[in-house]
Amino acid sequence: MKKIIFAALTAAAIGTASAATYKVDEYHANARFAIDHFNTSTNVGGFYGLTGSVDFDQAKRTGKIDITIPVANLQSGSQHFTDHLKSADIFDAAKYPNIRFVSTKFNFNGKKLLSVDGNLTMHGKTAPVKLKAEKFNCYQSPMAKTEVCGGDFSTTIDRTKWGVNYLVDAGMTKTVRIDIQIEAAKQ
């Protein structure tokens, strides 16, 4: 009896620890930003309908994330502000329709994911960023009927590294906080 239980537990552990590919669920993925507006208020907006994939090997504590953020899906709560954000002044959606993040390394402390290093491409320029994992988990989804992995990630960037310089000379901050929520279903 003990051998049967041990064999079943071993098989279950191998099944959950194997490498897998996950498809980003565009309905459970967004990237939001916040930028100080001349020390008076905070301007916010978000991108929705993110697409991409996550390769994750929980046992080896390795993975790769490749996410595309469509600039056309930007929303701010004000159509006038959204249109300005999409203009050549800021994101230049006509020339640069997508923002992309590709990971280079997953950083763990034991079994806990701490952060993901990677490259962010925006405005035709690529620079390294570190996404801090606020939380990360994998679970068996009762809705998707498969394993889903996801979490909340954050970083702060200097937007001028990507050539987004609007109003910097007038005193507006260079730093932008980015918060990303993502879930991806096992394929």
State the predicted function of each range.
Residues 1-18:
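Gram-negative bacterial Sec-dependent N-terminal signal peptides
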Residues 18-187:
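Low-complexity, acidic/polar, glycine-enriched regions of mature
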